[in-house]
Amino acid sequence: MKAIITVVGKDRTGIVAGVSTKIAELGLNIDDITQTVLDEYFTMMAVVSSQESQDFAQLRKEFEAFGETLNVKINIQSSAIFDAMHNL
C-alpha cells in the first residue's frame, strides 16, 4: 500500500513531530517527505507505505481527527488516485 498525506495549517512548533509520530503509530513508513512554510502557513506532503493492507476510510478518520488536535487539515489518499488526479 502506498499513499500520499498532505498537511496544511497555520505554522507552529510540533506539527512535523506530531504527524510523523501518528504515521508511525498507524504502522506506516515515511518513504519521502517535504515541508515548507509560506508566510505563516505550514504545508507538508509525505509519501507513505505499508507492507500491510490498510483501510483508507479508517486512516482518513484517524488523520482528520488527529489534525484537529494540531489545528491543521490532514488528508490521506491512495497514491494511484493522487497520480490520476494530478496527471498532466
Swiss-Prot record:
InterPro entries given in the database record: ACT-like_dom_sf, ACT_dom, UPF0237/GcvR_regulator, UPF0237_ACT
All copies of domain ACT, residue ranges: 4-77
Coiled-coil parts of chain: none
Family membership noted in the UniProt record: Belongs to the UPF0237 family.
PANTHER family documented for this protein: UPF0237 PROTEIN MJ1558
Subunit field text: Homodimer.
Descriptive protein name: UPF0237 protein SMU_72
Record organism: Streptococcus mutans serotype c (strain ATCC 700610 / UA159)
Phylogenetic classification of the source organism: Bacteria, Bacillati, Bacillota, Bacilli, Lactobacillales
